């Protein structure tokens, strides 16, 4: 540890080599979207057909403006890859129903599920996400605070997108022959870019060059835990800083075994959280526990 903090030298980041795969963006997609609650915190979850990509966004509130902003970000993920969203299926009680005319101007039809019949596609995906979260939590050495739990949900969604469509048979469509994310972006999954870290891996982050501290005795690294790989060309990862609790993005780091000091610190963060997180987190969909 002392060697890392004292001897680490900053080096320029190298762009990850991108291997392209065939991308089929000729078809118009249908988007399924709804809100789930993880320990009371709202998350907008969407799934597309036939690509089956999952996208999750943590919401600060359930207002129509906040929900619509998140859904627009989901749609932008597809449009930047030249896909076209033809329709969005939401629950009849969703805040997005009030924005139907706004989406109609964009050429997107907003359909609603019948009363009492929620978006079944999203309900199945929520169960899948919860199973993966529960598996990770079962082997973590400490409890989670709410912010880290939400980050874990986003991490799980990103990992699911690295898989093929389960049960998909060979077909001329690219989304049946590569990962869900690869089918969307046309870029092949890379171990060094997409699988660099696991959730809550402990690392020492390399501090960027700062002229005010470059020739001082200030530590050259800071401790943090991994939250979410961003899967971009620089192989950057989002981390939680242990000394300040702030989130930041870095591409240079050294992975280390998690010491007891860090485990105790994360346990203290969870204990100090105003709202206690259950060991088996509560996932709710329309008032029902999933």
Q: Which residues fall in each region the model found?
A:
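Retroviral integrase
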Residues: 1-131, 174, 178-290
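Surface-exposed, charged/polar loop-rich segments
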Residues: 115, 122-170
